[in-house]
A protein has these predicted regions:
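PLP-dependent class I/II
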Residues: 1-254
Length: 254
């Protein structure tokens, strides 16, 4: 399937005409990553069709194995049609502080500023000061956080693969988007998630929660340390053994 051809066809066939396209790379929940040439093509298509573009880039710093997440604003001409949302939640370990910023096309930025003036009174000043300090200070913390996620990713993915549950290591984000093993796929993601919770004591997000096309996946969050992650893998291993229909093919749990 030619993604860009399908996108252009969807734009052409839609009525009313789309006004805005939202991109999310690295993606949540799929962890999908793209290179700059993909972004360039998206800007070309959207410019030709006079569509605004919003890029939700929450995980640019949580990238592994040499991958670098491209900003949409690196593309020449993108400023004419695009804006980007950046969050400090993952890069600076500030989830719940609800702090980030928008940059890009001045009309889009002004529209958001006007809308927010109707909805709230601005962010608590100490949070703004903390965000400025994080952005302007030493960035060692960002590298440390990314290394923590990378280590957790490796333990989880290596452990699942050692059980015969084939998953790919994501190149970015703090998630693993895991296809449900074939022998359990008939359950769907919600029932399989319930089974993991009750029998393996492992909590995951059912893919159906992200849309119907996610129903053959579950999402793991890299939010527990390596020791707890190994405990989770042992719980999954025991569930597989008890079911006697999914056989471990690997060595041990790393």
């Amino acid at each position: 399937v030619d993604f860009f051809a399908e996108l252009e066809k969807a734009i052409k066939d839609s009525w009313p005409k789309p006004k805005l396209l939202v991109l999310n790379f690295p993606g949540n929940p799929t962890t999908q990553c793209v290179e700059l040439d993909f972004i360039e093509k998206m800007i070309e298509i959207d410019s030709e069709n006079e569509i605004w573009v919003i890029h939700d880039i929450a995980y640019p710093d949580n990238a592994f194995d040499g991958y670098k997440s491209p900003s949409i604003l690196k593309v020449p001409g993108a400023i004419e049609v695009a804006a980007e949302f950046y969050s400090l939640s993952k890069s600076y370990n500030m989830p719940g502080w609800r702090v980030g910023f928008m940059s890009g096309n001045s009309s889009l930025v002004a529209a958001l500023a006007r809308m927010k003036s109707y909805l709230d009174y601005g962010m608590f000043t100490p949070i703004q000061v903390a965000a400025i300090t994080a952005l302007e200070g030493p960035q060692d913390c960002v590298h440390k956080i990314t290394e923590t996620y990378r280590s957790r990713r490796n333990v989880l993915c290596d452990g699942l693969n050692s059980l015969g549950w084939k998953v790919e290591k994501p190149r970015a984000t703090m998630f693993v988007w895991a296809p449900i093993p074939e022998v359990y796929r008939h359950l769907g993601s919600l029932e399989f998630s319930k089974k993991l919770l009750s029998e393996a004591r492992v909590a995951v997000s059912p893919g159906i929660g992200f849309g119907e096309y996610g129903d053959d996946h579950v999402r793991f969050g890299l939010i527990e340390n390596e020791h707890r992650t190994r405990q989770a893998i042992r719980g999954i291993r025991d569930m597989f053994r008890n079911d006697q229909k999914f056989v471990s093919v690997g060595g041990g749990i790393p």
